[in-house]
């Protein structure tokens, strides 16, 4: 969330003339911030195109990733350019009405992004816990409903200030700052970060526990499977009783075990990668949401 205040740090009722812009500082900031914005826009577009252009990526999990990219793309293309201009000029140059809309879109995109990570963590928990039943549990219809809920909840959290849930705005229109109304600050902090964060942490703790248990079970199953195969081979070599039925059964069990092992390995790897991404994301957001309710 990019809420900045202008040169005037108070909520004075008089309009202050904007301070002169330092050209060298403005150029440096423009290059750095512009580069970051372009990098963010292109990166998220590439994610969306890679999923759209490869049919084998048309799965619910990848739809969640596209949703995350869409939220970040909206943020980088509609919010950050005005934030960059705000930072370069040192004051808000777009008027009070647009300030309120800009702030609401900022909250909408950031909340949708964080809730998108929450949905991904739930998806990874189901994938690791139920790798064989995953396609029947996480259907396309349920996935789309989850994404619809993400954006609906994000919209509810973001539009409060537009309907008056904020402190009186300063008359100086060069000031655009975060609403400090205590009720909304607490509501948005809980809904946008702390509740999703709690769900994410619980889900990844469960993923860790299940992955550890499944890894132990699969290793044990692998040893048993090898032992059974050796026994069958030994019986055939010694020309004991016919073992055709046992061989077929053993082959079926081995195939089922191999499929389960492959699916679990994929889900575990995906969960580990996304866990690192989510962890970095949470660490980046945590300072802001720790200071926000206090400030």
UniProtKB/Swiss-Prot annotation:
One of its GO terms (cellular component) is caveola. Residues 52-64, 123-143, 206-273 are cytoplasmic. GO terms for biological process: adenylate cyclase-activating adrenergic receptor signaling pathway; cell-cell signaling; phospholipase C-activating G protein-coupled receptor signaling pathway; positive regulation of cytosolic calcium ion concentration; positive regulation of MAPK cascade; regulation of cardiac muscle contraction; regulation of vasoconstriction. Keywords: Cell membrane, Cytoplasm, Disulfide bond, G-protein coupled receptor, Glycoprotein, Membrane, Nucleus, Phosphoprotein, Receptor, Transducer, Transmembrane, Transmembrane helix. SMART domains: 7TM_GPCR_Srsx (SM01381). The chain crosses the membrane at residues 28-51, 65-88, 100-122, 144-167, 182-205, 274-295. Glycans are attached at residues 7, 13, 22. The modification Phosphoserine is found at residue 215. Residues 1-27, 89-99, 168-181 are extracellular. This alpha-adrenergic receptor mediates its action by association with G proteins that activate a phosphatidylinositol-calcium second messenger system. Its effect is mediated by G(q) and G(11) proteins. Nuclear ADRA1A-ADRA1B heterooligomers regulate phenylephrine (PE)-stimulated ERK signaling in cardiac myocytes. This is Alpha-1A adrenergic receptor. It comes from Canis lupus familiaris.
């Amino acid at each position: 969330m990019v809420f900045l205040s202008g040169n005037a740090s108070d909520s004075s009722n008089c309009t202050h003339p904007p301070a002169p812009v330092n050209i060298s500082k403005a150029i440096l900031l423009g290059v750095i911030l512009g580069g970051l914005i372009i990098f963010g826009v292109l990166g998220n577009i590439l994610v969306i195109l890679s999923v759209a252009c490869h049919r084998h990526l048309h799965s619910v999990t990848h739809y969640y990733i596209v949703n995350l990219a869409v939220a970040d793309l909206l943020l980088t293309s509609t919010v950050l350019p005005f934030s960059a201009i705000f930072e370069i000029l040192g004051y808000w140059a777009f008027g009070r009405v647009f300030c309120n809309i800009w702030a609401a879109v900022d909250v909408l995109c950031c909340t949708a992004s964080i809730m998108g990570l929450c949905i991904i963590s739930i998806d990874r928990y189901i994938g690791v816990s139920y790798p064989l039943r995953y396609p029947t549990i996480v259907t396309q219809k349920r996935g789309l409903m989850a994404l619809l809920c993400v954006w609906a909840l994000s919209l509810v959290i973001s539009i409060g200030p537009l309907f008056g849930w904020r402190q009186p705005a300063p008359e100086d229109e060069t000031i655009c700052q975060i609403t400090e109304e205590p009720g909304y600050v607490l509501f948005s902090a809980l809904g946008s970060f702390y509740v999703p964060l709690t769900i994410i942490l619980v889900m990844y703790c469960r993923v860790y526990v299940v992955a550890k248990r499944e890894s132990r079970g699969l290793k044990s199953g692998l040893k048993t499977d090898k032992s059974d195969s050796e026994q069958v081979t030994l019986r055939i070599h010694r020309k004991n009783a016919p073992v055709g039925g046992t061989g077929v059964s053993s082959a079926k069990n081995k195939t089922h075990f191999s499929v389960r092992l492959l699916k679990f390995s994929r889900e575990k790897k995906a969960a580990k990668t996304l866990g690192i991404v989510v962890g970095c994301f949470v660490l980046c957001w945590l300072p802001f949401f720790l200071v926000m309710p206090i400030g």
